[in-house]
Amino acid sequence: MSDDKLFEITKSDLAGRIGILHSNHGKIETPAYVPVIHPVKQTIPAKKIKQIGFDLVITNAYITMKRHGETAIKKGIHGIIDYDGAVMTDSGGYQVLEYGDVDVSPIDMAEFEKKIMTDFAIPLDKPTGYGLSKKKAKSYVDQTLKVAKKTLDDSIDNGQLWLGPMQGGEHK
């Protein structure tokens, strides 16, 4: 998808803007609320979320990989969560932050996200969290940037969009 067809601004006022984000699974009006759904345990079924009016959801590719594996590749993320709108997947950065590591490389995670045909994918990052030295936090950000560049270099033109993870941290 070309950059000029990815996002269109329909109205702007001062620093704000309203627009339409285009994906392989439809249009998303922005700004948008984006519900997070668990790929295994859905309290509210994804179909119901679509009926309510949400055009985009976010789910976790790492959990999808661990619980569904090859089935997710065969069915795609839309089939796994039973949702026909746009889907964004996070690659497991929170799990890295929470548990210290995940048992998949960033490159393998990116390949998985490609294969499950998520509309918007986020490369596996190394979150900075809180309490790291400035040097350590910088090394985590540098590692994330390196992975993001490699992911983009290896991406294919299939309409899938890659988004950079937001890094926190307490240092300037």
Question: What is each stretch, according to the model?
Answer:
Residues 1-156:
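Non-catalytic, usually N-terminal nucleic-acid engagement modules in DNA/RNA processing proteins
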Residues 148, 155-157, 162-172:
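Eukaryote-skewed repeat-based solenoidal scaffolds used as protein-protein interaction platforms
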